[in-house]
Amino acid sequence: MKLARFSFEGKAEVYNGVIEGDFIHTYSGSPFEQIEILQEKYALHEVKLLSPIIPRHIIGIGKNFVAEGSIKPPMPELPIFFYKPLTTVIGPDDPILFPSNVTEAKFEAEVAIVIGKTAQAITPDEASNYILGSTIANDVGAFQFFHEEGHWTVGKAFDTFCPLGPYIDTEFDYNNARIIARLNGKELQNSTMEQIITPIHEMISYISGFMTLMPGDVILTGTPAGADFMRAGDTIECIVDGLGTLSNTVQQR
């Protein structure tokens, strides 16, 4: 099932929907409990897709991919995690806004995992039971604010620095998913989730050991080699086979 949030005809009202083919059907209820698909539907080309979720928390993992053909190192005892506030979240086609003190930032195409139910100190074997689904993320970072000893949050926390979308797929198999990123049409990232160092089930278990994960929380699972800098006027497309394309342009605020 492909879950989305959308608006229609420029109205402020936000609808929840299930995408089926070229249409999106509205639904009632909560994706974390039970939904009922309603008769009302819209053509996809008539609506504006929004971020498919407004998470309470966004947790990212850094340095979690190896280049294809490289020897994969063992999973680190202490993975690099960072935090993004919900004010970083935007949806498909929304602008990434650089504040006056940022002139360039890196894009990072990633698979994002959406948590489906409260998870506290769960085991890796239990992790799949706590996943609602997957979506695409662009984990934007202003590297000039990264601390040399690994403090990343400041550079990751600017408003609009976490595009998500276009939808959450509740049945997506992320294990071998291919991740691609194009900057102004030029392909700069192309790899698969097979190159991940800390597996997703281990990631979820580890995080749930030091903080309770809530329904709707988002985990950014890392990005392959090739991430590069983008500047005002650029367009970045993050593509995951089976999850669609997340496209955003960059503007100077």
Feature map (PLM): residue ranges:
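N-terminal non-catalytic cap/leader segment that marks the start of a structured domain
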Residues: 1-79, 172, 182, 186-187, ...
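Catalytic-pocket segment enriched in acidic/His residues
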Residues: 48, 52, 68, 74, ...
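Residue-level recognition of short, solvent-exposed, well-ordered loop/turn junctions
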Residues: 54, 60, 91, 106-108, ...
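Structural signature of FAD isoalloxazine-binding scaffolds in flavoprotein oxidoreductases
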Residues: 75-92, 107, 237-241
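Short, structured patches in soluble enzyme cores that scaffold and shape functional sites
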Residues: 84, 109-111, 115-117, 135-140, ...
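A structural-propensity feature for long, helix-poor, extended segments
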Residues: 92-112
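N-terminal accessory regions of nucleic-acid-interacting proteins
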Residues: 120-136
